[in-house]
Amino acid sequence: MSETAQSYDPTEDFQALVVTDSAAARVAQLIAQEESDDLKLRVFVSGGGCSGFQYGFTFDERIEEGDSVVEKDGVTFLVDPMSSQYLMGAEIDFVEGIEGEQFVIRNPNATTTCGCGSSFSI
């Protein structure tokens, strides 16, 4: 069995965030509605929420120095260095169910989460 050497691109950190097909597809739809191909989805962690930290999402046109960059199906996801330490190995998904549709982050680093799913503690 032969292995192909892969080049390392320091702007890409695939362990910072795992993105599902459904999450990438939904973000692509949202970007199309905004009519700006330069948009990227920034996923971040901030202080707050009932468990101490909360997840946030915003569109951004710029990749900042130190950002982890994850590409999935033509969509770019960004994570800043501070948030990256909390999101390492986390998965972002988009689910549709009886409760409606929403982005869900499954974070192996979170020790507790609140009922709303957008707040956690480590």
From Swiss-Prot:
Q: Entry cofactor note text?
A: Binds 1 iron-sulfur cluster per subunit.
The keyword Transport is annotated on this UniProt entry: no
> Cofactor(s) for this protein?
iron-sulfur cluster
Q: Which residues cross the membrane?
A: none
Q: What does this protein do?
A: Required for insertion of 4Fe-4S clusters for at least IspG.
State the SUPFAM superfamilies in the record: HesB-like domain
Q: Which InterPro entries match?
A: FeS_biogenesis, FeS_cluster_insertion, FeS_cluster_insertion_CS, FeS_cluster_insertion_RrpA, HesB-like_dom_sf
Superkingdom, taxonomy of origin: Bacteria
GO MF entries: 2 iron, 2 sulfur cluster binding; 4 iron, 4 sulfur cluster binding; iron ion binding
Name it: Iron-sulfur cluster insertion protein ErpA
Family assignment from sequence similarity: Belongs to the HesB/IscA family.
Q: Which organism is it from?
A: Alkalilimnicola ehrlichii (strain ATCC BAA-1101 / DSM 17681 / MLHE-1)
Listed under subunit, the entry gives: Homodimer.
Please tell me where iron-sulfur cluster binds in this chain: C50, C114, C116
Instruction: Show the Gene3D superfamilies listed in the entry.
Output: HesB-like domain (2.60.300.12)
Keywords in UniProt for this one?
Iron, Iron-sulfur, Metal-binding
